Amino acid sequence: MGISKIDKMHSLSKNQQIIFDIINKSTEPLKAYTILFNVQKKGIKAPLQVYRALDKLVEIGKIHKIESRNAFIACHNSSCQVAKATAFSICEICEKVTEISSASLSKYLTSFKDKDGMKYSKYNLEFFGLCKKCR
């Protein structure tokens, strides 16, 4: 598999790559201090180092922050790395997080204005319910 245009534009620092690899290998969203615990043996000792890397990885679309869980997941949807609209379904029982990829939802959200005319620059929506396994 080749390197995407986004990957060429945003080469990751050593710390960013280490942190991304840990998040990418995880099967569930990870909190910052869980990430810190996992990267300490790789030379990243300070919480600030983790937070800086997380901020950059979110900014370039390599990971997403699940606001309600204050946790991070890797993005496996290359179109997210250029979009400002993200949406997730979160199971209320098992807490499985699934990224919702919908061109029509993204198009609607980027054109949405509220009744006061506020034009939003980015969205992070979270929908809660029961996954197929937990119903």
Predicted regions, residues:
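A short, conserved structural fragment
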Residues: 58-66
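Non-DNA-binding regulatory cores of transcription-related proteins
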Residues: 65-69, 74-135
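Key DNA-contact positions within bacterial/archaeal DNA-binding proteins
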Residues: 48
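Short acidic, hydrophobic short linear motifs in intrinsically disordered regions
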Residues: 29-39
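Short alpha-helical segments that sit at the start of domains
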Residues: 1-21
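Short, basic interhelical loop/turn and adjoining N-cap
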Residues: 41-45
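Short, hydrophobic-biased segments on the C-terminal half of alpha helices
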Residues: 51-55
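Short amphipathic alpha-helical elements of helix-turn-helix/winged-helix folds
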Residues: 18-26, 38, 60
